[in-house]
Amino acid sequence: MPKSVIIPAGSSAPLAPFVPGTLADGVVYVSGTLAFDQHNNVLFADDPKAQTRHVLEIIRKVIETAGGTMADVTFNSIFITDWKNYAAINEIYAEFFPGDKPARFCIQCGLVKPDALVEIATIAHIAK
C-alpha cells in the first residue's frame, strides 16, 4: 500500500517526527492539529473558538491538498483541556460540518502546551 505525505503549500514542517497528513488507499489521516504558529507558539490563547477555527482550517488545507473536502471527513478525535469550552468548540465545529456530521469522540486531557485548548485528529475517505 503506497502512501503519500501531505504537506499543504505554505505550511512549515512540524518540529517533531510526524507530518501534517498522509494519504493511503484513498484515506487521508490528519495528524493531531493544534492552533500553533510556524514556531510552535500557541495562537489565540484563552479563545477556544478562534483556536478551533484555526485548527479546522489547517485540517481543511491538508484534506484539500490530498484532493478531498471536509464532506469526506468520516471521523474526528477531539481533545480539549476544559469542558467549559465544549459548547464554544462545538459551535465552530458545526460550521465546518454543516451537512452529515462525521463520527467523533471528545475527551478532556492535558495538551502539549498550557495555552492550547483544543487538538483535533481527522480521518477522511476521498471518493475515487
From Swiss-Prot:
InterPro entries found in the cross-reference section: RidA_CS, RutC, RutC-like_sf, YjgF/YER057c/UK114
EC number(s) stated in the UniProt entry for this protein: 3.5.-.-
Organism domain of life: Bacteria
GO cellular component, as recorded: cytosol
Keyword annotations of the record: Hydrolase
Any single GO BP term: uracil catabolic process
Keyword rRNA-binding attached: no
Family of this protein: Belongs to the RutC family.
Alphabetical list of PANTHER family matching this protein: 2-IMINOBUTANOATE/2-IMINOPROPANOATE DEAMINASE RIDA (PTHR11803), PROTEIN HMF1-RELATED (PTHR11803:SF58)
Name of the protein described by the UniProt record: 3-aminoacrylate deaminase RutC
Gene source species: Escherichia coli (strain 55989 / EAEC)
Gene: rutC
